[in-house]
């Protein structure tokens, strides 16, 4: 019996999305693009090799997430990062975009270096996770087949297909208020308001879509046009949104890992996500205020708030970047403690996919992409720790 056909059949039966078009392009070709080198195109749990199936599923999902993060950070690096190519981690840098870099430097003079380093880190994460999976003869994750979204046309950006869309974002900034709360915790059912309300409505671009949106302006106190500065401010808060997600996700999925070495991997990589988030949390608070900025595409007129006016309000004050002690596990039983939040493990992977989707990162993506990503997330959420 042909074992590969048997495994494909089992996965088609297990996942309804496999019945609705993914196989139409040919299992061998498309499957290789989806899962990389492994036992077969659509290996089910049997593709865990020498790993516990749950551990393999967690690592495979995180490898996919890191590819998504690497893709978006690559776009930021091309336009706004330090322009030193460091193959294989960072390539394709052609000089950046002077106006966008200037606008980012208004948040912090070291922003280009931080962007460069964050990009390098995410590349290393996805490379390591797939390499580890392969070393255990487990299926890997490879999303290259879905690099079909358009690039920015501004100077500095490569004209290549992308996994993510940074030009139609609706950014959740509730992480700002969540980490300042002394009484509330999302794991206990609490909700939080967006700190920068304008970013949580409509669609915003975090990179210049073209050179008209990336302009130096010596007459402006920021040295760039208000449109360019607004885009950089948006990026500053998006950086933190992405990395606070990773901060929680690794802690959430670590609770499902079985093998000590897999747990070590999750804790070790997760710690770097925390460092990223702390950095971007600090820099976002330096965003210059702006009034009456007109989006060249949507025509919307928007303001960016003066964050310095948050001073004295402990729910919003910019320099309160250390996690405030808050309720944990049980509000009545235990005192407040400074923690990462959320860390509830139930449906953590599916929650991460939803957050990315709500953010607008995948606007324009193929339906097969969503089916695959949700399938990987479901597998990760089904993992159970074994002792």
Regions found by a protein language model. Give the residues of each.
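Non-catalytic, regulatory and substrate/membrane-recognition segments associated with hydrolase enzymes
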Residues: 29
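Twin-arginine (Tat) signal peptide motif
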Residues: 10-15
């Amino acid at each position: 019996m042909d074992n590969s056909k048997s495994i494909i059949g089992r996965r088609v039966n297990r996942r309804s999305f496999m019945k609705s078009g993914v196989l139409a392009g040919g299992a061998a070709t498309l499957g290789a693009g989806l899962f990389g080198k492994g036992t077969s195109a659509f290996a089910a749990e049997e593709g865990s090799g020498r790993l516990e199936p749950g551990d393999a599923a967690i690592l495979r999902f995180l490898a996919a997430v890191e590819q998504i993060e690497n893709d978006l950070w690559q776009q930021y690096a091309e336009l706004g990062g330090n322009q030193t190519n460091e193959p294989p981690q960072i390539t394709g840098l052609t000089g950046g975009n002077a106006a966008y870099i200037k606008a980012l430097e208004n948040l912090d003079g070291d922003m280009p270096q931080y962007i460069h380093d964050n990009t390098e880190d995410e590349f290393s994460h996805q490379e390591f996770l797939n390499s580890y999976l392969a070393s255990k003869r487990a299926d890997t994750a490879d999303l290259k087949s879905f690099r079909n979204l358009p690039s920015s046309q501004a100077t500095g950006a490569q004209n290549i297909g992308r996994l993510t869309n940074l030009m139609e974002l609706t950014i959740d900034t509730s992480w700002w208020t969540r980490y300042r709360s002394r009484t509330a915790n999302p794991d206990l059912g609490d909700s939080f308001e967006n700190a920068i309300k304008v970013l949580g409505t409509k669609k915003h671009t975090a990179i210049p879509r073209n050179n008209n949106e990336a302009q130096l302006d010596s007459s402006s106190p920021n040295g760039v046009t208000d449109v360019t500065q607004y885009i950089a401010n948006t990026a500053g808060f998006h950086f933190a949104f992405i990395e606070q997600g990773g901060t929680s996700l690794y802690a959430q999925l670590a609770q499902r890992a079985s093998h000590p070495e897999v747990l070590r991997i999750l804790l070790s990589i997760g710690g770097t996500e925390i460092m990223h988030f702390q950095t971007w949390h600090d820099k976002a608070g330096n965003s210059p205020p702006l009034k009456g900025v007109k989006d060249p595409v949507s025509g919307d007129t928007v303001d960016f708030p003066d964050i310095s006016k948050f001073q004295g309000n402990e729910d919003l004050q910019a320099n309160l970047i250390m996690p405030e002690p808050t309720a944990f596990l049980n509000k009545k039983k235990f005192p407040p403690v400074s923690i990462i939040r959320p860390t509830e493990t139930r449906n953590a992977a599916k929650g991460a996919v939803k957050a990315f989707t709500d953010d607008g990162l995948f606007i324009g993506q193929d339906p097969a992409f969503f089916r695959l990503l949700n399938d990987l997330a479901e597998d990760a959420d089904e993992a159970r720790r074994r002792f």
